[in-house]
């Protein structure tokens, strides 16, 4: 019997494998995998459109596979839009997938305005047909009607309603003679190019519950963008702005959350913040420049620089928690509080009078490279008064030129929960916190939650009273 050398068998095996890869698998037991069985779009505002999401269709076989049909079940009438392997349209027929290969289907959604006030659901599916099988990828989006304001100037007294959110595109300006009043429960979403510029007056009248607070944030609500700092510019109280008041407001994910420029034009503070949360601002949470700000029972957290007060001004912070932790978005490299009486113009320090007071506050940071969380700088001979009373702070070098009374230094305030990996922060106080009962009576009856301060022998430090 004639024998063949081993190399012949190797060649024959290679030919067999090659032929197999060039042939199509036709059985119903062919393997098709999806990178996801559902694409979920978080809140999509009507008329604005969504981000693009994608799903991968994978041929898990060692032979070619013919996808006889990849189609959007709602067809051209669907609110979803497909791009199948680079070709736009609701359907593609007879798509060949090589052995082990895959293709991408890109999906967006555009939702028409309707009459619903509450969020509503929009659904469809993608059918993938092959070898007599039909499998489906589910598509789901939350739609939300809204008031849309593009490059808008408010030039007369205006009160918004809270039935629908407001989406700001291109910017919103409150003119010098106008007052904008935003009521409890209103939600305001800003596009990346949309600051709120206040030349007149802004009145925010929120309430203590999450559903009745007033929310200011970016308009990207899908993951992971919903928590990105710097997703919108922020709120700017400019030189002519007067009598601004924000109560139970949440300002999050801005570049500079609150900026107050120049002195008040009357005896009242330019900006009064009561029971507000300023969170996750990329550059600064509160930035004051020769201005006047009064803040009580406020939380300023996890910003590039939480509070920066420069070039003098008049500032009063009472029962505020000012805390920052390095996290997935912002490295903690700056003190949580910086106060100075000057700015540098060219090579010259220009000074202005400074009067700043901090009572019953917590200044803390961690997981960064900051050793002094409070920094105070003075130049020149202009009036300079910076006073701290009954505060807990993290400082290795106590600032010079200040007065301080009953301070607690470098003792962990024992916040309830800080989990940077999960981006979860609860700045309530644990039992046994050194901040409990260490404050003085300031006449403020309630904390940030709206709970009474009259618990224990004395008020607690920070924005939350341990109940």
Spans of model-derived segments:
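C-terminal motif of bacterial Sec signal peptides marking the signal peptidase cleavage site
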Residues: 15-18
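Asparagine-centered strand-capping/turn motif at beta-strand->loop junctions
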Residues: 57-61
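Beta-strand/loop edge motif enriched in small/polar residues
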Residues: 20-25, 32-43, 48-50, 54, ...
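Bacterial N-terminal signal peptides that target proteins for export
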Residues: 1-8
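Cytochrome P450 C-terminal beta-domain/meander region
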Residues: 449-453
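Short, solvent-exposed loop/linker segments at beta-strand-coil boundaries, enriched for Pro/Gly
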Residues: 73-91
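Short acidic/proline- and small/hydrophobic-mixed sequence motifs that coincide with surface turns
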Residues: 50-51, 62-67
């Amino acid at each position: 019997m004639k024998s063949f050398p081993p190399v012949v068998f190797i060649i024959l095996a290679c030919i067999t494998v090659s032929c197999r890869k060039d042939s199509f698998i036709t059985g119903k037991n062919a393997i098709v995998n999806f990178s996801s069985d559902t694409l979920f779009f978080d809140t999509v505002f009507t008329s604005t459109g969504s981000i693009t999401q994608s799903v991968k269709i994978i041929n898990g076989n060692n032979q070619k596979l013919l996808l006889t049909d990849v189609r959007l079940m709602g067809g051209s009438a669907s609110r979803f839009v497909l791009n199948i392997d680079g070709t736009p349209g609701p359907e593609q027929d007879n798509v060949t997938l090589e052995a082990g290969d895959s293709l991408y289907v890109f999906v967006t959604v555009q939702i028409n305005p309707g009459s619903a006030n509450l969020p509503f659901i929009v659904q469809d599916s993608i059918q993938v047909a092959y070898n007599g099988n039909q499998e489906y990828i589910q598509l789901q989006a939350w739609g939300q009607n809204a008031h849309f304001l593009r490059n808008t100037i408010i030039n007369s007294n205006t009160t918004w309603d809270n039935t629908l959110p407001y989406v700001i595109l291109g910017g919103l300006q409150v003119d010098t003679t106008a007052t904008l009043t935003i009521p409890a429960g209103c939600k305001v979403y800003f596009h990346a190019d949309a600051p709120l510029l206040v030349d007149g007056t802004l009145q925010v009248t929120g309430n203590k519950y999450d559903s009745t607070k007033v929310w200011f944030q970016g308009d990207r609500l899908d993951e992971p963008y919903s928590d990105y700092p710097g997703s919108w510019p922020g709120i700017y109280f400019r030189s002519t702005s007067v009598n601004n008041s924000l109560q139970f407001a949440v300002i999050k994910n801005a570049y500079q959350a609150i900026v107050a420029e120049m002195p008040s034009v009357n005896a009242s503070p330019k900006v009064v913040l009561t029971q507000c949360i300023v969170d996750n601002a990329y550059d600064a949470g509160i930035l004051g420049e020769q201005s006047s700000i009064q803040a009580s029972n406020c939380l300023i957290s996890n910003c590039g620089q939480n509070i920066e007060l420069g070039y003098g001004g008049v500032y009063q912070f009472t029962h505020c928690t000012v805390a920052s932790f390095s996290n997935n978005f912002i490295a903690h490299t700056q003190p949580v509080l910086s106060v100075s009486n000057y700015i540098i113009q060219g090579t010259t320090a220009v000074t202005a009078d400074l009067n700043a007071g901090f009572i019953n506050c917590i200044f803390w940071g961690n997981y960064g490279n900051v050793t002094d969380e409070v920094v105070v700088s003075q130049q020149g001979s202009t009036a300079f008064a910076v006073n701290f009373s009954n505060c807990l702070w993290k400082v290795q070098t106590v600032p010079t030129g200040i007065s301080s009374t009953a301070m607690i230094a470098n003792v962990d305030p024992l916040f309830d929960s800080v989990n940077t990996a999960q981006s979860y922060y609860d700045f309530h106080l644990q039992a046994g916190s050194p901040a409990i009962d260490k404050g003085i009576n300031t006449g403020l009856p309630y904390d940030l939650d709206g709970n009474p301060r009259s618990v224990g022998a004395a008020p607690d430090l920070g924005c939350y009273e341990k109940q």
